[in-house]
């Protein structure tokens, strides 16, 4: 039996905690680990980053994302063909110029551009659809640096244990406006009233295995 509900896992994360759910194990488990426990090998990881008018943020954050990816490779946590997928959501500034220039000079950076601004969730979805056949797992994360990128280590550990969905969950909404907090609470109440299983305060910061994306 696999857990039906999400569970909280620990970690010293200042801005994000994480929850994970385990689906039916449709994904291939590549190796048998210690004492017969099935473990996945290191995945080809795609880090999907939606961007909209981020010409000031990208020069600051891209080196951090690349350094994180390099460290994960160096520590043998992810495969050498792992990469960043940057999604330009119809930016009106030089965001796409920055992405395309970096992609030309760094094989670990790839990018796609939406014809117009379609919204954050559509940008994330476009990135996931682009990478789903090119990776074993993806992690989607915002470009603004508010999420703790070191939480990726724990997400990858859970993936290697066989979990297909790992949620980032906000430990606090204090940075949100009163209106955003109020509408979020109303949204979660509505979902609960409709009988949906709700992961409260979950963020777009999450890991998905390739079978889930497909």
Predicted features and spans:
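Alpha-helix termini
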Residues: 68-79, 106, 131-136
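Aromatic (phenylalanine/tyrosine) cluster motif
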Residues: 2, 7-9, 13, 20
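Donor nucleotide-sugar binding loop of glycosyltransferases
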Residues: 54-57, 91, 148
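Short beta-strand/loop segment that forms part of the nucleotide-sugar
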Residues: 73-90, 113
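Acceptor/aglycone-binding surface of glycosyltransferases and processive sugar-polymer synthases
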Residues: 112-116, 120-130, 137-140, 146-214
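Residue-level recognition of the N-termini of beta-strands and the immediately preceding loop/turn
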Residues: 43-45, 79-84, 109-110, 136-137, ...
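A conserved acidic beta->alpha catalytic loop
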Residues: 85-96, 145-146
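N-proximal low-complexity "stem/linker" segments adjacent to membrane-targeting elements
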Residues: 33-67, 71, 76-78
